[in-house]
């Protein structure tokens, strides 16, 4: 038993850590790292473990709160009434179990007859960003995001720009009214926004929710004002001081209210009608009442049929006990009300014919099989292409050209091929064969051992990788070409002026000045920066080539060991593995890179343009040679890059994690877990002054 309890505790800790990481990505950065279905599965597993082992429940568990802490860029707002999440259901059995619990509780409280079923108010689960609007004496005074449910971000200035949000309520408004609702963007308006963003060469959004969240959380309200945001109210928080009619039907809509609330209506539906009378937008298109589990499931099925025709995205429906006195009796658990349930839709699926499998070359050379499909309507859009991820996935799913396949919009965003439909494979179906050469540049395609991704080896030559290669090469840690950024590289490549790294060195100020957002002074400065990059250190040049697995430190070590680019190009794997800290994986990567004729050709072109790397300087002394440093926190004067350069110049190494092999940890302000780890292992800890003294700077 002790062993099982220990295993449960370990799994609970792992789940909490993973869920919190996903929460930060979803709630704070608006950049979800997993699909809703994957997140829900993790949360359900954690809930079950905590149910089985109640001694493991802690106030910090993700099951006891919602989301993640807000960013520091906005002011914080403490919710007087917590903005709780909802429990989820994924199948009819869970909906029926919810209905039974509600009915049993209300019958026990005398609010339902034995032969009577609960009445519910059913709504769409809008896929946007939850916010709370605070009105005082009818005037909008504050708007906040959900945040972690207890504390959100102050987005008042941005919300005031949303035309659907009234700045002053109509009629006799209460002294205090908190309105909860969803900010979202219609699909048609989302498409127009993305077309406009693309035309201005600005970031396009992944989906309407991402666009709505990103628009609402802009630091500049003027940007928010230009975005087609909508708002629908669906609930409330604090309600105090109703003029002329004081009732106490509902003491607190959730734990934490500052004083007793008074509401004008006794059902959830009637409260939404009241909010609409005050001038707040309420989504009434599909809202309706239903009785018992049978009514709930009928609503769910009807909305599922009508979902593709909706102007906005939804990811489920919401059921709420309609009677407010009944809601009060049912109450809350730590993170969700007992009187409400979200019934989620599965990722939408459809079947179609797989016409072909082609390969797509990514910006880093990754080769991805892409299914070309007979057009099919899935998840509100027409899908003609879908990812197959990698060669192993194609084999595992046994997908063949000519198959009838199931297509799913994973997470309602990214179309993917789930697999073939059993029994519908034609006699002439063909297996996919990974090409041996890149379809873009003709360079060899190789798949390193123990890796799922095949890659084009023509990094410096391949047009598909050109922009990313140039951006990396121009970086501060590589050739350090100041002024050569992403948008300028886009212009140079798209116009055909630059087809390889060597072409940069033939640019002149006259042709640069003709580009968009480039004047004579900027062009002159860029040409000067390119000229300075004709004599980089050998380590910088090697790093600039973008060889897989070769980072800044490895490039410097290899450069010091071999002394010239020619020696590195001609070294075999055994010789390369003889360089400091170069194992077989890195040695193989370097060897494959220079075995590709196109890459060797680029080196020759660089030489022809007058690029002559200088030998890498050796360490200034050998007292720190081979010593490993870890940097954590913020130093008063040096940046991390500056500290790293000084350490490397002294022969030391810089690592990202603390271990028994770490010689020194340099800790600045707000040092985190790395400092604690160093103290635990007895590693020497230095501040900035201590580091400078050690380096003799």
UniProtKB/Swiss-Prot annotation:
Cofactor(s) it depends on: Mg(2+); Mn(2+)
Keyword annotations from UniProtKB, A to Z: DNA damage, DNA repair, DNA replication, Ligase, Magnesium, Manganese, Metal-binding, NAD, Zinc
Reactions mediated catalytically: NAD(+) + (deoxyribonucleotide)n-3'-hydroxyl + 5'-phospho-(deoxyribonucleotide)m = (deoxyribonucleotide)n+m + AMP + beta-nicotinamide D-nucleotide
Matching SMART domains: BRCT, HhH1, LIGANc
Ligand binding (NAD(+)): 36-40, 85-86, 123, 146, 182, 320, 344
EC number: 6.5.1.2
UniProt-listed Pfam families: BRCT, DNA_ligase_aden, DNA_ligase_OB, DNA_ligase_ZBD, HHH_2, HHH_5, Nlig-Ia
Keyword DNA damage included in the entry's annotation: yes
UniProt GO MF annotations: DNA binding; DNA ligase (NAD+) activity; metal ion binding
Family that this chain belongs to: Belongs to the NAD-dependent DNA ligase family. LigA subfamily.
Name of the protein described by the UniProt record: DNA ligase
Organism for this UniProt entry: Bordetella petrii (strain ATCC BAA-461 / DSM 12804 / CCUG 43448)
């Amino acid at each position: 038993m002790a062993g099982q309890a220990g295993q449960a505790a370990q799994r609970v800790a792992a789940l909490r850590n993973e869920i919190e990481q996903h929460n930060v990505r979803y709630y704070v950065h608006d950049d979800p790292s997993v699909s809703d279905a994957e997140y829900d599965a993790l949360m359900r597993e954690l809930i079950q473990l905590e149910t089985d082992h109640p001694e493991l429940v802690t106030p910090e568990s993700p099951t006891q709160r919602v989301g993640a802490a807000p960013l520091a860029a906005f002011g914080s707002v403490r919710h007087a009434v917590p903005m709780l999440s909802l429990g989820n259901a994924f199948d009819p059995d869970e909906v029926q179990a919810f209905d039974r619990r509600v009915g049993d509780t209300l019958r026990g409280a005398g609010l339902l007859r034995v032969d009577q079923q609960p009445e519910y108010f059913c709504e769409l689960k809008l896929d946007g960003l939850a916010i709370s609007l605070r009105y005082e004496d009818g005037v909008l005074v504050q708007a906040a995001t959900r945040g972690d449910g207890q504390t959100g971000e102050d987005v008042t200035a941005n919300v005031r720009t949303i035309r659907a949000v009234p700045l002053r309520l109509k009629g006799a408004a209460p002294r205090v009214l908190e309105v909860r609702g969803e900010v979202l963007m219609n699909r048609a308006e989302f498409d127009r926004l993305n077309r406009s963003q693309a035309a201005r060469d600005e970031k396009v959004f992944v989906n309407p929710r991402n666009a709505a969240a990103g628009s609402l959380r802009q630091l500049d309200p003027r940007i928010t004002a230009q975005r087609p945001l909508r708002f629908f109210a669906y609930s409330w928080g604090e309600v105090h001081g109703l003029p002329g009619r004081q009732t106490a039907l509902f003491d607190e809509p959730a734990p934490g209210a500052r004083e007793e609330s008074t509401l004008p209506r006794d059902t959830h539906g009637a409260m939404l009608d009241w909010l609409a009378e005050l001038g707040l937008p309420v989504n009434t298109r599909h809202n309706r009442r239903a009785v018992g589990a049978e009514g709930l499931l009928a609503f769910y099925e009807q909305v599922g049929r009508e979902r593709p025709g909706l102007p906005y995205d939804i990811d489920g429906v919401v059921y709420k006990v309609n009677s407010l006195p009944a809601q009060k009796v049912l109450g809350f658990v730590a993170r969700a009300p007992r009187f409400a349930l979200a019934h989620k839709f599965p990722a939408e699926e459809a079947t179609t014919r797989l016409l072909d499998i082609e390969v797509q070359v990514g910006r880093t050379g990754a080769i991805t099989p892409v299914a070309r499909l007979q057009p099919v309507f899935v998840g509100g859009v027409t899908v003609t292409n879908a990812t197959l991820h990698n060669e192993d996935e194609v084999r595992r799913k046994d997908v063949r050209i000519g198959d009838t396949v199931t297509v799913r919009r994973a997470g309602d965003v990214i179309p993917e091929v789930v697999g073939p439909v059993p029994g519908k494979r034609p006699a002439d179906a063909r297996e996919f064969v990974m090409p041996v050469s890149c379809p873009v540049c003709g360079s060899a395609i190789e798949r390193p051992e123990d890796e799922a991704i095949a890659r084009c080896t023509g990094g410096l030559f391949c047009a598909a990788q050109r922009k990313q290669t140039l951006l990396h090469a121009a970086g501060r840690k590589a050739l350090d070409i100041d002024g050569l950024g992403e948008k300028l590289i886009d212009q140079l490549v798209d116009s055909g002026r630059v087809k390889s790294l060597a072409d940069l060195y033939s640019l002149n100020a006259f042709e640069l000045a003709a580009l968009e957002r480039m004047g004579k002074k900027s062009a002159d400065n860029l040409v000067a920066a390119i000229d300075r990059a004709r004599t980089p250190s050998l380590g910088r040049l090697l790093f600039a080539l973008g060889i897989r697995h070769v980072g800044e430190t490895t490039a410097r070590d290899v450069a010091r060991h071999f002394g010239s680019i020619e020696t590195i190009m001609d070294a075999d794997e055994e010789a390369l593995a003889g360089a400091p800290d170069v194992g077989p994986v890195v040695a193989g990567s370097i060897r494959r890179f220079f075995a590709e004729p196109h890459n060797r050709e680029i080196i020759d072109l660089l030489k022809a343009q007058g690029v002559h790397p200088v030998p890498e300087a050796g360490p200034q002394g050998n007292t720190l040679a081979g010593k490993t440093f870890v940097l954590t926190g913020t130093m008063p004067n040096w940046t991390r890059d500056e500290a790293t350069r000084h350490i490397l110049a002294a022969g030391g190494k810089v690592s990202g994690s603390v271990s028994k092999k770490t010689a020194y940890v340099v800790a600045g302000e707000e040092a985190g877990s790395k400092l604690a780890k160093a103290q635990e292992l007895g590693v020497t800890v230095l501040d900035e002054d201590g580091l400078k003294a050690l380096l003799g700077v």
